[in-house]
Design a protein with these regions (language model features):
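Extreme N-terminal leader/targeting segments of oxidoreductases
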Residues: 1-25, 43-51, 550-591
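Glycine-rich Rossmann-fold phosphate-binding loop(s) that bind the pyrophosphate
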Residues: 29-35
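Glycine-rich FAD pyrophosphate-binding loop
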Residues: 42-70
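Conserved FAD-binding subdomain of flavin-dependent enzymes
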Residues: 72-113
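Rossmann-like flavin
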Residues: 100-207, 219-220
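Short, glycine/acidic-rich hinge or "gate" loops at secondary-structure transitions
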Residues: 104-111, 528-538
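Helical element adjacent to the flavin cofactor pocket in flavoenzyme catalytic cores
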Residues: 203-285, 290-291, 303-304, 309-318
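C-terminal segments that line or cap access tunnels to active or ligand-binding sites in enzymes
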Residues: 207-219, 283-285, 294-515, 521-535
Length: 591
């Protein structure tokens, strides 16, 4: 497996891999990453579809990319996906996945046309004082010292950040700035999360720094991700004859590890409560989704809280990874990520408006008609003075194909589930859907005498508790996550957010899909490059632009410095003023 860039490799079709007709594949899970791997197995690996098996412990595919209407409960989306135009693997695959809505076009075509016609932008990124604009006004609010802290992290070697927290590298000024408000709520970072991952994010998305305040850097699907992404992939795979095995838990995978060679030998299954075993040869490839950010998720209801379940059940992704990791040090250290759910949980809720009474409060903040079919909030609106640090969003409506006319379906989440609310004096984790809606309505500016009635009769709110949703953000070191294909591995790979691949960042659709592509390309030795992570961190134009944007447009020549430094800088500027370098510095407002 090797990385490539440019359209020479991107547009090429690889030859059929040697002996692929003799091989079979077994994939743990049916989340985005497993579906991606399966798609690459049949598209580029040209493996027979009937040789590809996906094991799903539940009755519905999709993993974390959900979007369902549960009978008697209502619409539920555990999360949302923020996409980027440089998700290179994602678009490499979705150009080949047919739309299930429009004949003759791909999922990428649909997505591209939609976001060209209706580009995303937020008209109100944050509120405070019960629905008033917080007037962050597109500013980061960083001093030169704060900017230097961020720059220092950007250039710090990875090994110096192992097991360090964000509070080890940022001081109170940065953590109290608009920059951190935008960043932590957009990506769900907590102050105690990994400084290494924070650095990787800065480098990965340096080209989007200017788009953080108004979220114009983001792209969104038309509907929820289950209907817009997962269902087209399922249909594509079913068209190849790929086999889905539902209600099938993978309870263990047994390996032979000796003399530098590692081989998966047996898959242990629990199929409808009956134990089964699949014996493996070197031609049987196993793709393992280890861990899982939505494991142990629990769904509440309008009148019921979502329970906090921290037990690692058999067949659970964490239990499976622990059993696998015990067999070889190269298989990672799951305990680094799943041992403290108080540090890794947060809650979300799906709000469905049932009549028109809440709509004006939404419209007052987003400054758009929510029923227009176009962008509504343009990404999350963060409630800056919320005790739960609530953020909420309404994407293009309808969010579900079967959504009744006149209803809106939105999503909110709170980073602090253990803190009493501002209006509802209970921790978010103890609240029913109605109570969470009441807290949200309070922050929208609904008059207090009307709040309970609106929450009860004008909305249906379904809470979800996710104990391990940010487990991958916990401080880590090299080796805590296994490589996608560990050294010496013969017939297996690790997939998803808890597999290690260079330069990309977790908690993104792209990271999952990238590990799926890398796994397939490595094990089948496919003769085509995997698109490298977008290289903006090496592009001097993006670096110059980000440096000025972080300073809210102030040129770097305006930095506070001693007179001798300013004198020397002036001399340098004079020398380069009429050169290409000088023009570049002027174009990006460095001078």
């Amino acid at each position: 497996m090797y990385y490539s860039s440019g359209n020479y490799e991107a547009f090429a079709r690889p030859r059929k891999p040697k002996d692929v007709d003799r091989k079979s594949a077994y994939l743990v899970g049916t989340g985005l990453v497993a579906l991606t791997a399966a798609c690459y197995l049949v598209r580029d690996g040209q493996m027979k579809g009937e040789h590809v098996h996906l094991f799903e412990k539940g009755a519905i595919p999709g993993g974390a990319c959900d979007g369902y209407q549960y009978p008697g409960i209502g619409y539920v989306m555990r999360g949302g996906r923020e996409m980027d135009d440089h998700f290179e693997v994602m678009w490499d695959l979705f150009r080949s996945i047919p739309s299930i809505e429009t004949e003759g076009v791909s999922v990428l075509d649909e997505y591209y046309w939609l976001n060209k016609k209706d580009p995303n932008v937020s008209l109100c990124r944050a509120t405070e004082q019960q629905g008033r604009d917080a007037h962050t006004d597109g500013r980061f609010g960083l001093s030169d010292r704060g900017c230097m802290e961020i720059m220092k992290l950007f250039f710090t070697p990875d090994e110096q950040l192992y097991d360090k927290r964000i509070t080890d590298v940022f001081d109170a000024e940065v953590l109290g700035s608009n920059f951190w408000l935008y960043w932590r709520t957009m990506f769900a970072f907590e102050n105690w999360h990994s400084a290494l991952e924070m650095k990787l994010y800065l480098k990965r998305y340096v080209h989007h720094v200017g788009g953080l305040p108004d979220l114009r850097a983001l792209r969104f699907t038309k509907y929820n991700q289950y209907e817009s992404m997962i269902l087209p992939m399922i249909r594509y795979l079913e068209g190849y004859g790929v086999r889905f095995h539902y209600n099938t838990k993978v309870t263990n995978i047994e390996f032979d590890c000796a003399d530098g060679k590692k081989q998966a030998r047996t898959i242990c299954l629990l199929v409808d409560d009956h134990e089964e075993r699949v014996d493996l040869t070197e031609n049987d490839l196993v793709f393992i989704t280890n861990g899982g950010c939505v494991e142990n998720s629990s769904i509440g209801a309008q009148d019921q809280p979502a329970a906090l379940d921290t037990v690692l059940h058999p067949g659970n992704g964490w239990d499976l990874w622990k059993k696998i990791a015990a067999q070889d040090p190269a298989f990672g250290h799951p305990e680094k990520f799943c041992s403290d759910p108080e540090q890794t949980n947060w809650m979300s809720a799906t709000v469905t408006t049932l009549d028109e009474r809440i709509v004006p409060y939404i419209q007052n903040i987003c400054k758009r008609d929510p029923f227009s079919g176009g962008v509504v909030t343009g990404g999350i609106v963060t409630i800056r003075d919320s005790n739960w640090l609530l953020s909420w969003t309404f994407n293009r409506q309808p969010q579900f194909r079967n959504q009744p006319k006149g209803q809106l379906v939105g999503w909110l989440y709170g980073l602090f589930s253990d803190t009493p609310g501002n209006y509802v004096k209970k921790p978010m984790r103890d609240c029913t859907g109605k109570e969470i809606c009441m807290e949200w309505l309070y922050h929208l500016g609904v008059p207090e005498p009307e709040i309970e009635d609106l929450a009860e009769h004008s909305a249906n709110t379904v809470p979800v508790m996710m104990p391990y949703i940010t487990a991958f953000f916990m401080p880590r070191a090299a080796g805590d996550r296994p490589a996608v294909v560990p050294e010496g591995a013969v017939n297996f790979a690790f997939l998803g957010q808890f597999a290690e691949t260079p330069r990309d960042t977790i908690f993104t659709t792209e990271y999952s899909m990238r590990t799926g592509m890398e796994a397939v390309y490595t094990l089948l030795d496919i003769d085509r490059g995997v698109p490298e992570v977008w290289g903006s961190t090496y592009d001097v134009r993006d670096l110059l632009n980000a440096a000025v944007q972080l300073r809210d447009g102030r040129p770097l020549s305006d930095l506070k410095m001693r007179w001798i430094e300013r004198f020397a800088l002036g001399k340098v500027i004079d020398r380069v003023q009429e050169t290409d370098l000088g023009r570049l510095l002027q174009e990006y407002k460095i001078i």
